[in-house]
């Protein structure tokens, strides 16, 4: 063993040695010979396309979350096999923030949720107050500190979970796509807070994230996974160069400055941020004797952007004709909607009125807590306004039966896809939505076969062929969204 290897082992807070894992009834391994060391105080970013094994790997780093299946290999935390650590010790030293915020909330008040973990670990009231105040300040929770958890938006719930975990000051903090339900401003603020905690407290961070432009500048190292294996490990510039060399599709997810750098021959270091990219561009342009403003004019003309745009147009043309044909008839409308969660609380939706035409694609935008999810729940009759009404096909939505409304008119995809799942496998879940398939004769049998064809068709469209026997809760966040 080399001196460098000895040094790495000495400084490693986490070691994963030849880890393999397969879910029950699955021939293909979700993790295949994964080996990795994480240094104490390191900021490690784990990335890869949906279903590559990121979430599965992270769940193995805390035994209460580890899925059932066939497993071999070794995981050491500070030199101790992670399976030999008690749940209490893991709770205190290894923080874990899940993708789904509702899976971690256990109390009904925001302030109590912040304090719950510390109370469970036996901290004194004075320490609890200090740490709760610290986290509330970090995350800007002061304005909703005394609110009921049920009143929070998905983004606010995730912020609360993050603050609750960080209040325990763990040695290692694992975050599985923590900003997936935050708006861009809140996500940026949160990631800055994570960087600050890593710098000030020396907490080791293992983060999976799709907003790579936000996290790459803070990352000490990046791990790229593909098909259950580690594809490459290195600093952000090294990862960019390696993915470009392999012509791997993950290169398209790299920060824009890295993608621009890859198109130009240069001896300068690879830029990560826009600021670094501007400096690099100035140096390159000076050497070539051209203006930065005109540096890529010829490149824009020569690149295959127009070809790609043309191909995209061809692909979407048939969908445009079928689904977005301009029509004047209004399919959904709301008139002067008002809603609040309690008589004593302020209104969340205030005098909202708008209409939606058939075939129209309508985007409802806004920051966390602005009433987006509440509005959608009113439009789908999941909540009832205390004033105003919703019209569907010109008819008051309250006059539709549940079966008629949700079978013939509305499909609702919730923020949390797990709220739809009721079966033990992906395949059973899909058949449940069409009423199941039973072999019968004549017309009933034909109806059952039509349902089977419908399910098989949607399986191909959403690329779920290899996941049919998997439990819905064992899927990654992206796979759960596709199933939902």
Where are these regions (language model features)?
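Catalytic Walker B motif of ABC-type/P-loop ATPase nucleotide-binding domains
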Residues: 173-176, 182
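Conserved ABC transporter NBD signature motif
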Residues: 70-81, 90, 388-398, 406-407
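Helix-to-loop junction immediately C-terminal to a conserved catalytic motif
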Residues: 62, 380
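Conserved ABC ATPase signature
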Residues: 148-152, 156, 471-475, 479
């Amino acid at each position: 063993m080399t001196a460098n290897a000895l040094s790495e082992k000495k400084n490693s807070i986490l070691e994963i040695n030849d880890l393999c894992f397969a879910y029950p009834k699955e021939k293909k391994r979700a993790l295949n010979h994964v080996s990795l060391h994480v240094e104490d105080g390191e900021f490690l970013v784990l990335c890869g396309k949906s279903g590559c094994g990121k979430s599965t790997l992270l769940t193995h780093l805390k035994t209460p979350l580890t899925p059932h299946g066939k497993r071999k290999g070794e995981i050491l935390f500070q030199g101790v096999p992670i399976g030999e650590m008690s749940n209490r010790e893991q709770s205190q030293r290894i923080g874990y923030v899940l993708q789904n915020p509702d899976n971690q909330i256990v109390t009904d008040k925001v302030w109590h949720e912040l304090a719950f973990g510390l109370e469970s670990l036996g901290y004194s009231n004075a320490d609890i107050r200090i740490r709760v105040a610290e986290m509330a300040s970090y995350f800007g929770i002061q304005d909703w500190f005394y609110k009921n958890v049920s009143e929070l938006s998905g983004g606010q719930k995730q912020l609360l979970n993050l603050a609750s975990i960080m209040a325990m000051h763990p040695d290692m903090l694992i975050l599985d796509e923590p900003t997936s339900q935050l708006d861009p401003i809140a996500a940026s603020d949160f990631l800055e807070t994570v960087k600050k905690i890593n710098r000030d407290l020396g907490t080791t961070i293992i983060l999976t994230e799709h907003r790579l432009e936000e996290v790459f500048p803070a990352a000490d190292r990046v791990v790229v996974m593909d098909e259950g294996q580690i594809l490459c490990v290195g600093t952000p510039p090294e990862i960019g160069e390696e993915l470009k060399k392999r012509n791997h599709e993950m290169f398209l997810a790299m920060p824009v400055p890295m993608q621009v750098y890859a198109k130009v021959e240069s001896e300068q270091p690879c830029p990560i941020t826009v600021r670094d990219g501007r400096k690099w561009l100035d140096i390159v342009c000076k050497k070539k004797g051209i203006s930065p403003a005109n540096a890529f004019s010829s490149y824009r003309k020569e690149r295959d952007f127009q070809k790609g745009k043309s191909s995209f147009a061809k692909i979407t043309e048939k969908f445009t004709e079928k689904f977005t044909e301009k029509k004047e008839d209004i399919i959904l409308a709301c008139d002067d909607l008002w809603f609040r969660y309690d008589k004593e609380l302020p209104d969340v939706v205030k005098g909202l009125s708008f209409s939606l035409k058939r075939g129209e694609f309508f985007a409802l935008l806004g920051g966390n807590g602005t009433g987006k999810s509440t509005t959608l729940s009113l439009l789908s009759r999941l909540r009832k306004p205390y004033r105003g009404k919703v019209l569907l096909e010109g008819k008051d939505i309250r006059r539709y039966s549940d079966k008629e409304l949700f079978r013939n008119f509305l499909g609702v995809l919730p923020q949390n896809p797990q709220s739809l799942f009721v079966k033990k496998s992906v395949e059973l879940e899909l058949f449940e939505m069409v009423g199941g398939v039973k072999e019968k004769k004549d017309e009933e049998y034909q109806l059952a076969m039509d349902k089977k064809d419908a399910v098989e068709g949607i399986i191909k469209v959403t690329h779920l062929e290899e996941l049919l026997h998997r439990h819905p809760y064992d899927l990654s966040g992206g796979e759960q969204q596709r199933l939902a």
